[in-house]
Amino acid sequence: IKDMKKMNIEASLFGLMYKLKSQKSLADKYSRIMKRQNVTLNEATKLVKDGIRFTIVFPKEKYVDGVLNVWSQLLKNDFNSITRKGKDEIRWDVGDGYQGINTLISNDNDTSIEIQFHTKNSIKYKDKLLHPLYEKLRKNCDEKLSLKEMEEKLKKSNINPKCISYKKDLIRAEKKIPIPERIKKCKSLKKKNNRINDLKSCQFIT
């Protein structure tokens, strides 16, 4: 944050009181993973990578410069891998109650932290609008299912119709969030032999 301020890039940390997942939150997540993937508790704990998380917020017009600066600083220090949570490429997420860039940062010891990158608008909508809708969906349905998958299950009477209604509410709410300019996608970043992948390989629109 201090380095970005020196570069005249405005940034702030959001929600530091939630940087560590609570015991209840972790227990709930372990339970969901065990049920969905049919794994043991020990296996489920190894699959959870977001026990520590931070959220960095930028003004919309400074978003891309801010994100690239943070990635560069992390790779110059103790971290060697930046990936999008659960995916092969890093991009602005749309869907499932999330709007922003959500990354996992890892070191040689396979210690990971989650860093979310938001604009002032996207964090406001996430906190006040999307999160309550997502929690309603998560508590009553399988939130990982797409709308299309839910509709297929409904044909077989394998899902509560309310789940589709919750999902549609979430999709409608997401459309209200402005997407920053110059956002497209970026390949996962890794550091090899102390050399950083060229950040220019990130396909941000200029």
Segments from the language model and where they lie:
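Surface-exposed, low-hydrophobicity interaction/linker segments
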Residues: 1-38, 68
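Long beta-strand-rich cores associated with HINT superfamily self-processing modules
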Residues: 35-202
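Low-complexity, intrinsically disordered segments with a bias for serine/threonine
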Residues: 205-206
